UniProtKB/Swiss-Prot annotation:
Cystine pairs: C187-C427, C321-C335, C345-C368, C352-C361, C390-C397
A GO BP entry: proteolysis
Main location: other
Coiled-coil regions listed in the entry: none
Organism: Pyricularia oryzae (strain 70-15 / ATCC MYA-4617 / FGSC 8958) (Rice blast fungus)
Pfam families membership: Carbpep_Y_N, Peptidase_S10
Family of the protein in this entry: Belongs to the peptidase S10 family.
Signal peptide: 1-18
Location of the protein in the cell: Vacuole
The organism's taxonomic lineage, starting at the top: Eukaryota, Fungi, Dikarya, Ascomycota, Pezizomycotina
Name by which UniProt lists this protein: Carboxypeptidase Y homolog A
The keyword Disulfide bond belongs to this UniProt entry's keyword annotation: yes
Enzyme class: hydrolase
Length: 552
């Protein structure tokens, strides 16, 4: 659903280890980021083995971390992933459609000469299959539109990603298609469906409540549980970094649009929030790297995302101390302590950016999360909405997540959707911790955005009351980003955002746009903008999908 904070304050022995031989740098370009990710995919074998590689400089960092987190060593020893939850694969006869990636990979287009003959669709797809079934709207009552659910299967690696597709309520033959991704990492996109922007929500009586401001009012939407072992998705193994998840997304979309070509000709967009600020630049880059594809990617949208940690972490102190438009929630001494910690935090993040090494990126995550987020978190306030306290710590401050979990764990719901796991959880904190301990948290995926801007429009929007991925940091990184349109973007003026229906002239936000880059600040909204500002969110999304702020 969002940046999950239960593991923000963990200690890590890997915070102080020497770089492995052959560590790849995450600098510029998608290929270098893929190489760097490969170097961090193997988890630590034992705590003691990792400690043996500690350098004197790393030892100093580790000693500092132990002062900050006294039980860090014990927490590090218990990091290693637990067994996946039980699952039972349904027979092929339970599905209406099965698409084999090997069949798509075998499709060729004959040219006038042998040199001009080429595969119809790029990418290694032979290990992937897609299963789909029609969902009877009358059984669940979430919406009356055509729906499909199913799994993308990576047969070679025992990975199975669950998705739920809703057709547009308006004109599905022509309306765009949107892929929605929640963050975490490790939180189910079905919470986005049933809590934020989907056609229905779950109330305290575990009943469906119609959402008149659903994003599928004017777009067909795919809600995807990813990476594996999130929501209804499952695997015998795990995914611990964003790049590894990117190939699964490309395969899912390729096979889905092959099975359902009636949606393939429409414009396609990727949208998400929170840790999707990591996912989306990588996933979009993966798609665009394949020149022969059946995915008509037109834009990406990131809401209250974690995209550039170096800039984002600079703005935690201002947001908590009264400079983000809301009153201070920390004392002067606490604010000063955050100021004092910032230079070290930024130095560690920069080291992660420069090296791309897990041994640099993990300590940056641990130190900065403790020093820059910890003081706020210890107040008991909602990290996703600075305006109030955390109402339900067992459900990431929102009781509605508990309602959703109860609904999605009902046998009749799981059967209607074809879910193959034994139970549903809104967030898998093993995944969250796994991504953190493999160095993914601080990776500079924002460096992929300039190349995206050369090809497609990018929207960054942020609710102004969020703390964890606050608007100050999101505005800051968009203005710091090095790209060819930087000067014009930074000189662009803000304009008010008002509802297109014009029945209310009071602005619900403000927007600045130049070239392919657009930033929106949404008023009176926390981390989940569609939840706090339902009508405004569907307003700006519909206008964005229609191309209102796209470069001419």
């Amino acid at each position: 659903m969002r940046i999950a904070t239960s593991t923000l304050l963990v200690g890590a022995a890997s915070a102080a280890f020497a770089p492995q031989d052959g560590t790849q740098r995450v600098l510029n370009g998608f290929d270098s980021i893929k190489s760097a990710a490969h170097s961090i995919q193997k988890p630590l074998q034992t705590f003691e083995e990792a400690m043996a590689s500690m350098t004197s400089e790393a030892k100093a960092n580790w000693d500092h971390l132990k002062l900050l987190v006294p039980d860090a060593e014990e927490q590090a020893k218990t990091f290693f992933p637990k067994k996946p939850k039980p699952a039972s694969r349904k027979p092929d006869s339970a599905w209406d459609h099965i698409v084999k990636g090997a069949d798509i990979q075998a499709m060729w287009v004959e040219g006038a000469t042998p040199e001009e003959t080429h595969r119809k669709i790029d990418g290694k797809l032979d290990n992937y299959n897609l299963r789909a079934r029609s969902v009877d709207p009358s059984k669940l009552g979430v919406d009356t539109v055509k729906q499909y659910s199913g799994y993308l299967d990576d047969e070679a690696n025992d990975k199975h990603l669950f998705y739920w597709f809703f057709e547009s309520r308006n004109d599905p033959k022509n309306d765009p298609v949107v892929l929605w991704l929640n963050g975490g990492p490790g939180c189910s996109s079905l919470t986005g469906l049933l809590f934020e922007l989907g056609p229905g929500a779950i109330n305290a009586k575990i009943e469906i409540v119609h959402n008149p401001y659903a994003w599928n009012n004017n777009a067909s939407v795919i809600f995807l549980d990813q990476p594996v072992n999130v929501g209804y998705s499952y695997s015998g193994g795990s995914v611990s970094n964003t790049v590894a998840a990117g190939k699964d997304i490309y395969a899912l979309l390729t096979l889905f649009f092959h099975q359902f070509p009636e949606y393939a000709k429409q414009d396609f967009h990727i949208a998400g929030e929170s840790y999707a600020g990591h996912y989306i630049p990588v996933f979009a880059s993966e798609i665009l790297s394949h020149k022969k594809r059946n995915i008509n990617l037109k834009s990406v949208l990131i809401g209250n995302g974690l995209t550039d940690g170096l800039t984002q972490y600079e703005y935690y102190r201002p947001m908590a101390c009264g400079e983000g438009g809301w009153k201070a929630v920390l004392s002067e001494s606490e604010c000063q302590a955050m100021d004092n910690a910032l230079p070290r935090c930024q130095s560690m993040i920069q080291n992660c950016y420069d090296s791309g090494s897990v041994w640099s990126c993990v300590p940056a995550s641990i130190y900065c999360n403790n020093a820059m987020i910890g003081p706020y978190q210890r107040t008991g306030r909602n990290v996703y909405d600075i305006r109030g306290p955390c109402k339900d710590s067992g459900n990431l401050c929102y009781p509605e997540l508990g309602y959703i979990s109860e609904y999605l764990n009902r046998r009749e719901v799981m059967e209607a959707l074809g879910a193959e796991v034994s139970s549903y959880d809104s967030c898998n904190f093993d995944i969250n911790r796994n991504f953190l301990f493999q160095g993914d948290w601080m990776q500079p995926y924002h460096r992929l955005v300039p190349e995206l801007l050369n090809q497609i429009p990018v929207l960054i929007y942020a609710g102004d009351a969020d703390f964890i991925c606050n608007w100050l940091g999101n505005q800051g990184w968009t203005e710091a980003l090095e790209w060819k349109g930087k000067k014009d973007y930074n000189r662009a003026d803000y304009s008010p955002l008002t509802l297109a229906s014009a029945h209310d002239v009071k602005p619900y936000g403000k927007v600045k746009s130049s070239g392919n880059f657009t930033f929106m600040k949404i008023f009176e909204a926390g981390h989940m903008v569609p939840y706090d500002q339902a009508e405004p969110s569907v307003d700006f999304v519909n206008r964005w999908l229609a191309g209102e702020w796209f470069a001419a």
